[in-house]
Amino acid sequence: MDAKRFLLRCAVNLILLENEKVLLLLRGNTGFGDGNYGVIGGHIDGDETAREAVIREAQEEVNIHLNPECIKFVGTIHRKLSHCEYIDLFFVAESWSGLLENKEPVKHVHYKWFELNSLPHNTMPLVNTAISNYVNGIFYDEFGWDE
């Protein structure tokens, strides 16, 4: 049978924590979420695990190295956009090596630490939901289906 199968996209997201604060990056010039804060993350490129993808994204975006054993999976959000669907996988890390540096200044205006319970008003709604879910122990959620 040659049925066309539905395909969805998968992204990884890193909630990087230090002293009850989360690292957020202000997006710019990406065409998606510009002017809003997001977390480290991106698409799984293929031929890599989700954990490998989040390690790669951390290196590419903020120049840090994560030990795979120190990355904890904390949740999934099934996200609906107008043109496609995503599975977003969320991980937490509280230890890393290397000095934080904005390695993608074209995509990220800057990065900043924020209290977990006091995120800026311009945090991307998906990220706001994901961080709230993490704090409240919610491991699965759906986003964008009511719009």
Locate each region found by the language model:
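Conserved N-terminal beta-strand and adjoining loop/helix that marks the start
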Residues: 1-23, 92
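Short connector loops at helix/strand junctions that flank enzyme active sites
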Residues: 9, 17, 34, 39, ...
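Active-site-adjacent beta-strand/loop module that shapes the phosphate/pyrophosphate-binding cleft
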Residues: 18, 77-100, 112, 133-138
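Conserved Nudix-box catalytic region and its N-terminal flanking loop in Nudix hydrolases
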Residues: 21-60
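A short beta-turn/loop motif at secondary-structure boundaries
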Residues: 31, 79-83, 105-106
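A short coil-to-beta-strand element that immediately follows conserved catalytic motifs
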Residues: 65-75
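NUDIX/MutT-family hydrolases
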Residues: 102-135
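Charged phosphate-binding loop/patch that engages nucleotide di/tri-phosphates or the phosphate backbone
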Residues: 129-147
